[in-house]
């Protein structure tokens, strides 16, 4: 199988959108392909609608890939979003692929204490919103579970994991834990994050030495 990792950001004061994409082989997590795609930002920043600003470059990064991934991990949110449509959900809808949001910070919701051991998690819950389906499951407080606050490494702040598209919460957590190495981030988003932070404006495609 193939797992993709994606990191989207802005450059030139927001004028340029940059999407960094890595494609890894599962289960070895060997890097097969990587792409950095830049294009002019088409939409102004609107709170709650950031994914609409990010999606054109994100989709553009997938075009040169020689193979289609089976799963995508995105640095950002899935349904752990006020409109239940973070960038991971949005991208999954466009590509019709399973996606997982792996956020370094919380966008919305509440959570209790996160256990200290690696792989442990606590639910991220939010009040019910009109975007939630009619048959959404509610906890004993009448709240919706929108993600997991995951201890990905002992002694480090947790990650905010949420299903994006075609993915359950348990499945999302399981995949992230299986892709953890020695650092806080799972390998797909760690490598995408590293690729995104490389200096220089050269668009790269293909396999590069790690």
Model-derived segments and their meaning:
Residues 95-114:
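Glycine-rich phosphate/pyrophosphate-binding loops
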Residues 44-49, 74-82, 156-163:
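Flexible, glycine/proline-enriched loop segments at strand-loop-helix junctions
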Residues 4-6, 32, 73, 100:
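Hydrophobic/aromatic beta-strand patches that form the interior of the parallel beta-sheet core
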Residues 59-90, 95-97:
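Catalytic-site beta-strand/loop segments enriched in glycine and acidic/polar residues
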Residues 55, 60, 66, 104, ...:
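C-terminal binding/interaction regions
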Residues 1-11:
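Two-metal-ion RNase H-like nuclease active-site motif
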Residues 13, 80-83, 107-111, 156:
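Short, well-ordered, mixed-charge alpha-helical segments that flank or form enzyme active sites
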């Amino acid at each position: 199988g193939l797992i993709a990792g994606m990191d989207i950001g802005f450059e030139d004061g927001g004028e340029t959108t940059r999407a960094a994409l890595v494609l890894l082989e599962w289960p070895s997590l060997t890097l097969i392909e990587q792409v950095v795609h830049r294009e002019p930002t088409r939409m102004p920043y609107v709170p709650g609608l950031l994914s609409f600003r990010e999606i054109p470059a994100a989709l553009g990064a997938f075009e040169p890939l020689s193979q289609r991934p089976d799963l995508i991990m995105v640095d950002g949110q899935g349904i752990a979003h006020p409109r239940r449509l973070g960038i991971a959900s949005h991208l999954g809808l466009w590509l019709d692929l399973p996606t997982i949001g792996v956020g370094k910070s919380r966008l919305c919701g509440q959570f209790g204490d996160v256990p200290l051991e690696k792989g442990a998690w606590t639910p991220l819950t939010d009040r019910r919103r009109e975007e939630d389906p009619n048959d959404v499951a509610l906890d004993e407080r009448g709240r919706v579970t929108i993600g997991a606050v995951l201890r990905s490494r002992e002694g480090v702040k947790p990650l905010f994991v949420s299903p994006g598209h075609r993915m359950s919460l348990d499945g999302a957590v399981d995949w992230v834990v299986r892709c953890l190495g020695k650092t806080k981030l799972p390998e797909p988003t760690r490598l995408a994050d590293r690729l995104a932070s490389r200096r220089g404006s050269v668009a790269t495609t293909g396999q590069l030495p790690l």
